A protein has these predicted regions:
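HhH-family (HhH-GPD) DNA N-glycosylase catalytic core used in base-excision repair
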Residues: 1-144
Length: 144
């Protein structure tokens, strides 16, 4: 049903052309809002979709400041272990910390954190020695 309704929305609102969602170099908030209008799309999906457009498909927007990080378990673990947030379960703090770190495009650090969390900074048995963040990681230093 959700997929059908998305196709129907693209047909009705965007003249059967999904690229009209980001046509004309709109600001990132407008693109995220357009994705939020699709049934089933929450903030995480909407910002992730905008992030994919920019990062993987090189879609230009007037700005990138409304493309937030998606605070999944890997990203939150990285931020917590790096000492950027006090608790691993704090979604809002993760988003705002990413905005503080790189206000012009907070979502750009999403994939790097996700990959580091999946490959090195695992919940159990982290591979700190191979991690690209080990030189600036207080958790690694404390374990060392």
């Amino acid at each position: 049903v959700v997929f059908y309704e998305a196709l129907q929305r693209i047909h009705d609102v965007y003249n059967d052309d999904a690229s009209e969602i980001w046509e004309g170099c709109p600001n990132s908030a407008a693109v995220v809002c357009r994705f939020l209008q699709f049934k089933g799309a929450g903030v995480k999906i909407a910002t992730m979709a905008a992030n994919l457009l920019v990062r993987d498909y090189h879609v230009e927007m007037a700005d990138y400041c409304s493309i937030d990080i998606s605070p999944d378990a890997h990203v939150r673990r990285i931020f917590h272990r790096l000492g950027l947030i006090p608790r691993e379960d704090n979604l809002e703090m993760t988003i705002y910390k990413a905005r503080e770190l790189y206000p012009c495009y907070p979502g750009i650090i999403d994939v790097a954190c996700w990959e580091i969390g999946r490959e090195y900074c695992r919940p159990k048995n982290p591979d700190c020695e191979s991690c690209p963040m080990s030189s600036c990681c207080p958790t690694h230093e404390a374990m060392g």
